[in-house]
Amino acid sequence: MEMNEITVDNETMAHIAIFEKIARIELMECVENEDMILFVVGEHKMAEMFRKNKEVISQLKEKINKHILVAEVSRDLLTFVRNIFFRYGVNEIQISWKNNRTDIVVGVKPEEIGKVIGKEGKNIKLFKDAVSRYFNVNSISVKQ
């Protein structure tokens, strides 16, 4: 997996330190906006994280004061996208490779669409940013 170069600010560095202290596993990626933070962990690390600390999500939310999402990375694009959107009741993922473009449409539970998109599209942008760090993706949208 090829990763793009990323600049990390002091706040993100602090969030990474908090995650690693509470979750007690190594973090691969941290992507955030004003309302949400997505922590990406290694393959098969979620079970280990919850074995070490069942209250990890609530403790992170208490310390960071943002909506917390944790997803396992995968070398497979479909699996990685499913992992990121899992919490929203993903029921369909369409990946289109045409004209040197990779476009993804994700279907989630109807009541979750607003949360996935976020205010002014901030959450869906965050998810695209996370996926784009590992895969060359042009767009991610939510099936309406």
From Swiss-Prot:
**One Pfam family named in its UniProt record:** KH_5
Where in or outside the cell it occurs: the entry states: Cytoplasm
| All residue ranges annotated as the KH domain in the record | 101-144
UniProt GO molecular function: RNA binding
The main location class comes to: cytoplasm
A GO BP annotation: DNA-templated transcription termination
**According to its UniProt record, which protein family does this protein belong to?**
Belongs to the NusA family.
Function (record text)? Participates in transcription termination.
Annotated protein name in UniProt: Probable transcription termination protein NusA
Organism, as annotated: Thermoplasma acidophilum (strain ATCC 25905 / DSM 1728 / JCM 9062 / NBRC 15155 / AMRC-C165)
